[in-house]
Amino acid sequence: MCIRDRILVEEKINSRLASKVELVQKMTKYHLKTGGKRLRALLTLQCAKICEYQKGLRDVNLAACVELIHAATLMHDDVIDSADIRRGKKTLNTIWGNHSSILVGDYLLSKCFEMMVEDGNLELLKLLATTSSEIAQGEVLQLQHNKEIDILEETYLNTVSYTHLRAHETLSH
C-alpha cells in the first residue's frame, strides 16, 4: 500500500467515525492513535486491484471496512482477555471500562456496515456480515475451551478457522 493509499484509508476511517457522542469520539481517536500496520487494508487494496474493484474509492471504502472490523474485534478481545496493554498503550477497557469498549466496538462494526450498504454490493456486504458472525462464533468457541488443557485438535482448528481464516478468506473474494 503506497503512502497515498494509506492516507486515503486513514481519512476514510476518521471521517466515518465522527460522532456527536463525546466519549465515542474520544475512544475511537485514542484507538486509532495506537497505530497498527494496516496489513488488512494493504491486502484488501491489492485484492481489489486484482479484481478490478477500484471504481471511485470502492477499494478504499472496503479497506477501511476491513480495518474497522479488525479494530472492533481487538476492542472486544481486550475486554474478553482483560488486557491492559495493546501496542504499548493502555487498552480502551482499562481507561473507559468494559461496557464502553464493547459498545464502541459495536459502533465500529455498524459504521463498517453503513459503508458497505452505501456501496451497494450486496454480495460483499453478505460476505463481511458472514465473516463478522463467524469471527464472533470462533471467539465463543475459544472462550468455551480456554481452560481445557487437553483441547482437541479439531476444536482448536475450528476456533482458528472461525477467528482467523474466515477473515483472510474474505480478503480473497
PLM regions with names:
Residues 1-5, 163-170:
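Conserved small/polar residues in nucleotide/adenosyl-binding loops
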Residues 28, 108-109, 160:
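Hydrophobic alpha-helical core bundles mediating ligand binding, dimerization, or RNAP-core interactions
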Residues 3-69, 75, 79-94, 130, ...:
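Conserved N-terminal diphosphate/IPP-binding helix and adjacent helical/loop segment
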